[in-house]
């Protein structure tokens, strides 16, 4: 799984995920599924924001990289991808500027067009189940929730999907590609099922002839790994570094 992640995701995303796991003492060589999940969530957040701007009339527009209008204001403020201190600083600034209610938990994005925070979810399970879990945790009508699955399904608060159909299709296609590439490498079942992940981990450890004292237990504790990424101020140039992430994963 680790090799797959390094091949499939943009190096910047991989580096951010590595730092996140290291900060919380999580070994990416053991918790490879979490490593893949963090990278996937980061990429979806970036793809959600990329190419979306607000013009001088306050209208939301989609702009490609080579368009001179790329200096326009980004429609979305990316909160995910920053360390906690920086992230809360951004949230507080947004609240002070827009009058938005401060969320209890760090959201992933802020939508300047619809003036609301957004929580992005990527699930390997049923979208409605994950949506309800998110809603029960957040317990706020002021944070918009948008859930994507690896099967092309999605669910959003009040069926308001925020983005245009083409932008959402791009995200769904990327997630489906990740699933297919995992399946081609025999990784998908273990990514979905903790029991299968444990079996795969033991198999990998045995094949690599690692030391006998290395833990083989798959940890399933909940952490804030997604919230402690390094500061990464997003500007109009960020899409250049991320564009490679949108390409299909290289075949084995």
Swiss-Prot record:
Gene Ontology annotations of biological process type: viral RNA genome replication; viral translational frameshifting
Record's signal peptide: none
Keywords: Decay of host mRNAs by virus, Eukaryotic host gene expression shutoff by virus, Host cytoplasm, Host gene expression shutoff by virus, Host mRNA suppression by virus, Host nucleus, Host-virus interaction
Catalytic machinery residues: 80, 108
Localization in the cell: Host cytoplasm; Host nucleus
Top-rank taxon: Viruses
Site (Important for efficient shutoff activity and nuclear localization): 195, 198-199
Annotated site location: Important for efficient shutoff activity: 28, 65, 202-203, 206
InterPro entries: PA/PA-X, PA/PA-X_sf
Pfam families: Flu_PA
Gene Ontology MF: a single term: RNA binding
Family statement drawn from the similarity comment of this UniProt entry: Belongs to the influenza viruses PA-X family.
Domain text: The probable endonuclease active site in the N-terminus and the basic amino acid cluster in the C-terminus are important for the shutoff activity. The C-terminus acts as a nuclear localization signal. The C-terminus is recruited to host protein complexes involved in nuclear Pol II RNA processing.
Function: Plays a major role in the shutoff of the host protein expression by cleaving mRNAs probably via an endonuclease activity. This host shutoff allows the virus to escape from the host antiviral response. Hijacks host RNA splicing machinery to selectively target host RNAs containing introns for destruction. This may explain the preferential degradation of RNAs that have undergone co- or post-transcriptional processing.
UniProt-recorded name of the protein: Protein PA-X
Organism listed in the record: Influenza A virus (strain A/Swine/Colorado/1/1977 H3N2)
Name of the coding gene: PA
């Amino acid at each position: 799984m680790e090799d797959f992640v390094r091949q499939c995701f943009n190096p910047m995303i991989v580096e951010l995920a590595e730092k996140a796991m290291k900060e919380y003492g999580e070994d990416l060589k053991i918790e490879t599924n979490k490593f893949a999940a963090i990278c996937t969530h980061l990429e979806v957040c970036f793809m959600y924001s990329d190419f979306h701007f607000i013009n001088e009339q306050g209208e939301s527009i989609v702009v490609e990289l080579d368009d001179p209008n790329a200096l326009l204001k980004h429609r979305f403020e990316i909160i995910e991808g920053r360390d906690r201190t920086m992230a809360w600083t951004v949230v507080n600034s947004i609240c002070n500027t827009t009058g938005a209610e401060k969320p209890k938990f760090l959201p992933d994005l802020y939508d300047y067009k619809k003036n609301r925070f957004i929580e992005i979810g990527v699930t390997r399970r049923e979208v409605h189940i994950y949506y309800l879990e998110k809603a029960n945790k957040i317990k706020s009508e002021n944070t918009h929730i948008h859930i994507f699955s690896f099967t092309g399904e999605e669910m959003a608060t009040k069926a308001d999907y925020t983005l245009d159909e083409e932008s959402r299709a791009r995200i769904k296609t990327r997630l489906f590609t990740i699933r297919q590439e995992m399946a081609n490498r025999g990784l998908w079942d273990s990514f979905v099922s903790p029991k299968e992940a444990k079996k795969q981990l033991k198999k990998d450890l045995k094949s690599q002839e690692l030391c006998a004292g290395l833990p083989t237990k798959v940890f399933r504790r909940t952490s804030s790994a997604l919230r402690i990424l390094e500061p990464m101020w997003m500007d109009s140039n960020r899409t250049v570094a991320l564009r490679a992430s949108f390409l299909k994963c290289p075949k084995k």
